[in-house]
Structures are given as structure tokens and as C-alpha cells.
């Protein structure tokens, strides 16, 4: 019975060595793998992710509405300008938009609502995936609601600047003299909050896929900025990081709407200043093939 002891000890030693070797290999493998969780950017806002989940729509087909098969096509009406007029109009439009700046000092002077109606109507002419028009523009005029919006945003923005955004981002913003204090959310007579609808609903209650919803709404935002500039108003593009869910509840918006952008709108205050920034010349932004 005793002669088996050395054999058992040897077997146990071999087993222990094998376990440690495999443990070392496992650790080396983990070190070589990309650290997706550790390196995840803390400033990525879930509300800003495009949610055109086509696979989910296919799997849950009974919950989703099929699109219309037939849409009437009509003759297209078009203004064909002479070349000189085209050049003139394009140059004038460029000069108008080249004056657009991000203005953080906005007066409390009231803006005609008809103008706001028109600029949002203009934004609604944007193209969209399968003509789903996946946007909702919430116009806030009530001072109490504006102040609640400011409170929510400043609470989250302080955390963003102190923790989420990181040293590099905060350093890059120093030259623009921005911080988490957003006084313009109180002073601007109008706040426009632009929501993307990640899906829609048909009359029968079934869901409708909104293809490329974030790209579509982003195009609408660009047109809205141009329309505001054309009307003689100023704004600053604001993307309230991690504020979407709270603002959605405050404004009574449904869960399938996600906040994409907030625009304070009004006239510049008398003491308004902007950074003396230069835009890239054409040869740095255009490539002709």
C-alpha cells in the first residue's frame, strides 16, 4: 500500500504543474484580446445610437407594419436657372451661411412664432429613409419648463466635464470657453429639442421601421440651422450627453423618441462674442476625381 505514495505524489505534482501552465496561457490570451469594456468611451450616449434594428423587425414580423406597395408618381417641376444666376445664387447662399456662428449669448427678446413655424416646416422638407420622416421638433417657450431643462442639463454636464468626457476633450474645449453652465437655456426665448423616432406606428398600432433615422434627422437639423440663419436668428448646437431620458420624461415624449439635439433660438445679446475661428478652405474639404 505504501509503495503507491510516491506515484500518487508524482501524479499530483504533474497535475498541479499542468493547471498552472494552462492558467498562464489563459491570462496571456486575455491580455492579447482587445479590452472592449475597459476601453469603452464613457461619453457615448445610448440615445445617440442609430436604432434601425432590421433584424429585430424581421424576427418579430407580426409586430411590424409592411410599407405601402404603391405610391403615385407625378411630373417633377423644376426651375432651370441660367448659369450666371446659378453662380450668383450659390455665392449669395454661401456668404449667408458663412456668417453663421455658434452663439452662446442670446437675448430674451421674443421671436415671432410664425418664424419658428416656418423654419421647422423647412426642416421637415429633409429627405429621409423610405420617406419615414422620423423627426419630432419640440418647441419650448414656457420659462418654468426651460429652467427645468437647464437644471437637468447642467447637472449632467457637470458630471460630463468632471468625469465622463476625459481630459483631452475638456482641454480641446478650453479655447472655446465652454463649461457646464448654460445660461442661454433660460434667456433664449425659444428652445427647440429635436428627437429622432427610432421607429413609428401605423394606424393599426403596428410598428413601422424608420430606416437611417439618425442620419435623416441630422440632415433635418442641418436644414433647420440654415433656415434659422436665413431668418436672422442665432443658435448653438447642443447635444445634452446623458440627458435624453430625463428630458423625454419632462416633455412627455414616448419611449421610441430619442433626443438628438437641442437648439436655443433667439437674437444675439448686445454683448455677444464668438471665438475668432477660421473655416477650412475649399481645397481642404473637397476632392475632385
UniProtKB/Swiss-Prot annotation:
Transmembrane segments: 1-21
UniProt-reported outcome of changing residue 105 to Y: Activity as the wild type
Result when mutating residue 101 to A: Strongly reduces activity
E.C. designation(s): 1.21.1.1
Membrane topology: Single-pass membrane protein
Tissue: Expressed at a high level in thyroid gland (at protein level). Expressed at a high level in thyroid gland and at lower level in kidney and trachea.
GO biological process, one term: thyroid hormone metabolic process
Catalyzed reaction equations: 2 iodide + L-tyrosine + 2 NADP(+) = 3,5-diiodo-L-tyrosine + 2 NADPH + H(+); iodide + L-tyrosine + NADP(+) = 3-iodo-L-tyrosine + NADPH; 3-iodo-L-tyrosine + iodide + NADP(+) = 3,5-diiodo-L-tyrosine + NADPH + H(+); L-tyrosine + chloride + NADP(+) = 3-chloro-L-tyrosine + NADPH
Biased composition (Acidic residues): 59-69
Stored SUPFAM superfamilies: FMN-dependent nitroreductase-like (SSF55469)
Region of interest: Disordered: 29-69
Keyword Lyase: no
Basic and acidic residues composition bias: residue spans: 29-58
Function in brief: Catalyzes the dehalogenation of halotyrosines such as 3-bromo-L-tyrosine, 3-chloro-L-tyrosine, 3-iodo-L-tyrosine and 3,5-diiodo-L-tyrosine. During thyroid hormone biosynthesis, facilitates iodide salvage by catalysing the oxidative NADPH-dependent deiodination of the halogenated by-products of thyroid hormone production, monoiodotyrosine (L-MIT) and diiodotyrosine (L-DIT). The scavanged iodide can then reenter the hormone-producing pathways. Acts more efficiently on 3-iodo-L-tyrosine than 3,5-diiodo-L-tyrosine.
Stated family: Belongs to the nitroreductase family.
Designated name of the protein: Iodotyrosine deiodinase 1
Organism, as annotated: Homo sapiens (Human)
Amino acid at each position: 500500500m505504501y509503495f503507491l505514495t510516491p506515484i500518487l505524489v508524482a501524479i499530483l505534482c504533474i497535475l498541479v504543474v499542468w493547471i498552472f501552465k494552462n492558467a498562464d496561457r489563459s491570462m496571456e490570451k486575455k491580455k492579447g484580446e482587445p479590452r472592449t469594456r475597459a476601453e469603452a468611451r464613457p461619453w457615448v450616449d445610448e440615445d445617440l445610437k442609430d436604432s434601425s434594428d432590421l433584424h429585430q423587425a424581421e424576427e418579430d414580423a407580426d409586430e411590424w407594419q409592411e410599407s405601402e406597395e404603391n405610391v403615385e408618381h407625378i411630373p417633377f417641376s423644376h426651375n432651370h436657372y441660367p448659369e450666371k444666376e446659378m453662380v450668383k445664387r450659390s455665392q449669395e447662399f454661401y456668404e449667408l451661411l458663412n456668417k453663421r456662428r455658434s452663439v452662446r449669448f442670446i437675448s430674451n427678446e421674443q421671436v415671432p412664432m410664425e418664424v419658428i413655424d416656418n423654419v421647422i416646416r423647412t426642416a421637415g422638407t429633409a429627405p429621409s429613409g423610405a420617406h419615414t420622416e422620423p423627426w419630432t421638433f419640440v418647441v419650448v417657450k414656457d420659462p418654468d419648463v426651460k429652467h427645468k431643462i437647464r437644471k437637468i442639463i447642467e447637472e449632467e454636464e457637470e458630471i460630463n466635464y468632471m468625469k465622463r468626457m476625459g481630459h483631452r476633450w475638456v482641454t480641446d474645449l478650453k479655447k472655446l470657453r465652454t463649461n457646464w453652465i448654460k445660461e442661454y437655456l433660460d434667456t433664449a426665448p425659444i428652445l427647440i429639442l429635436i428627437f429622432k423616432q427610432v421607429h413609428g406606428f401605423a394606424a393599426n398600432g403596428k410598428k413601422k421601421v424608420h430606416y437611417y433615422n439618425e442620419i435623416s434627422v441630422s440632415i433635418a437639423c442641418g436644414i433647420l440651422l440654415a433656415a434659422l440663419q436665413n431668418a436672422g436668428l442665432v443658435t448653438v448646437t447642443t447635444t445634452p450627453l446623458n440627458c435624453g431620458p430625463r428630458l423625454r420624461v419632462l416633455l412627455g415624449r414616448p419611449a421610441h423618441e430619442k433626443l438628438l439635439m437641442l437648439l436655443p433660438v433667439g437674437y444675439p445679446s448686445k454683448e455677444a462674442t464668438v471665438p475668432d475661428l477660421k473655416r477650412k478652405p475649399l481645397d481642404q474639404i473637397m476632392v475632385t476625381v
